[in-house]
Amino acid sequence: MKLFLRSHAVLILLFLLQGLFVFFYYWFAGLHSFSHLFYILGVQLLILAGYLAYRWYKDRGVYHWLSSGQEGTDIPYLGSSVFCSELYEKQMELIRLQHQKLHETEAKLDARVTYMNQWVHQVKTPLSVINLIIQEEDEPVFEQIKKEVRQIEFGLETLLYSSRLDLFERDFKIEAVSLSELLQSVIQSYKRFFIQYRVYPKMNVCDDHQIYTDAKWLKFAIGQVVTNAVKYSAGKSDRLELNVFCDEDRTVLEVKDYGVGIPSQDIKRVFDPYYTGENGRRFQESTGIGLHLVKEITDKLNHTVDISSSPGEGTSVRFSFLTKM
Amino acid sequence: MNKIMIVEDSEDIRGLLQNYLEKYGYQTVVAADFTAVLDVFLREKPDVVLLDINLPAYDGYYWCRQIRQHSTSPIIFISARSGEMDQVMAIENGGDDYIEKPFSYDIVLAKIKSQIRRAYGEYAAKQGEKVVEYAGVQLFVERFELRFQDEKSELSKKESKLLEVLLERGEKVTSRDRLMEKTWDTDIFIDDNTLNVYITRLRKKLRELNAPVSIEAVRGEGYQLRAQS
């Protein structure tokens, strides 16, 4: 209603001016009868009121819609007047176009993810062949090849997960998961990595705590942090701690290493995509995508992750989980 | 002798699996015509089927359903697909187990054994006590028992596992990494120093048995067995 009055303020003002003009015109023309003058003024105001009432009746849908908060993309029926139905049509058209664009983009994204998945699977077969061929061989050359193959496998996995992340909403399942079992399976799947770099994990778990999460995604995220920790500990320290602390309503997992640490100017940006920092330059093999994925995944899973480090002494990454739903 | 049928469109993987399984005493059959997998199955009557999902013509799920109409033999899927859905589909279409690529020989062998044990029972299980032998030295893997001629020696679980790997590989160099990996069990594992200790202990046990085998260190590479004449 306010909006309606405001948008017709000029009209009302105009009518009032006109009224005053007519009033004074007749007054100075010699018509000094108040009853006549007020009659003319009254008729004019009545006509104005009639017009406004008519407009309000016809267009009230639009004004209600405009002044209400926007919830969703639906447009209510606006009214039957020419103005209203035209506006309605136009809006619908616009929404249709937007939807179409959105669908096209989504379809493209889908196709991209499918392509990526297929591509990864295609590469996995020759990788399996290489693996099978060199599995029984232990000479240094083959150890080297094994190491490189492992690197490719890690890369593929990261690729797979980062492309799936865009469709996360369709690909996750929150359930009660035992954190210690999850950690054990992480350790199991990275054991070759630990051996290669001679860094040994140690688990300190308070009790067997259940957390609510998606096991697959969380495993991947922890795996990323663990591989980082191992990579930056190699040759400096052979310890990697996986500590679990339990609070009343939170469970905290700390992945603590005694490696090279992260320079203080880099620590704020380690979760940024493609940010590699000084360690990235010093150690190569860094894409700057791993920790970014970790952050994205933990956000989506409703966990938090933070990182602290002192250069030369080590790094600790802390995941925090709600223990209750 | 158990017969394994391999249905896999990558020729390399097929060949490697075939070699490996034959080395471990299995008979193998491969299906090379992917439009007639069922015919091969019915003709050869294998004990276990290894089945890829992505195949030309029909996919693995289809063949699994076809085979299931005639037989209940164990079917193990092997596929590069890593999604949960694919594994669920595999089991729901009648598969018994699922191996994800890239895989290791050990996994394939272990899963085949377990399927045979489950499907054909005692008969196969009895055959299955694993004995590893090198230069007359025998290791009874399941009992952690080392034998040479009439002498016996008990080993710990870790020692037995280490020696199993060493005996199997014999003169081939075995890297420290491999030994560590084979003995790794969740968060209980052998690091470099402990590995040295274990090797020393194994050498002592072999000496006590008067076994004509010695564990030689190969500098920078690992260990190898040498038979003394």
UniProtKB/Swiss-Prot annotation, chain A:
All residue ranges annotated as the Histidine kinase domain in the record: 118-325
Residues recorded with modification Phosphohistidine: 121
Entries under InterPro entries matching the protein: 2-comp_sensor_kinase, HATPase_C_sf, His_kinase_dom, Sig_transdc_His_kin-like_C
Annotated TM spans: 9-29, 34-54
Gene Ontology MF: a single term: protein histidine kinase activity
GO cellular component: plasma membrane
Enzyme class, spelled out: transferase
GO biological process, one term: phosphorelay signal transduction system
Cytoplasmic side: 1-8, 55-325
Entry membrane topology: Multi-pass membrane protein
EC number per UniProt: 2.7.13.3
A Pfam family: HATPase_c
Catalytic activity: ATP + protein L-histidine = ADP + protein N-phospho-L-histidine
Function comment: Probable member of the two-component regulatory system YxdK/YxdJ. May activate YxdJ in response to the antibacterial protein LL-37.
Name of protein: Sensor histidine kinase YxdK
Encoding gene (name): yxdK
UniProtKB/Swiss-Prot annotation, chain B:
Signal peptide positions on this chain: none
Key words, A-Z: Activator, Cytoplasm, DNA-binding, Phosphoprotein, Transcription, Transcription regulation, Two-component regulatory system
SMART domains in the record: REC, Trans_reg_C
Organism this protein belongs to: Bacillus subtilis (strain 168)
Name the record gives this protein: Transcriptional regulatory protein YxdJ
Source species, domain of life: Bacteria
Transmembrane segments: none
Pfam families per UniProt: Response_reg (PF00072), Trans_reg_C (PF00486)
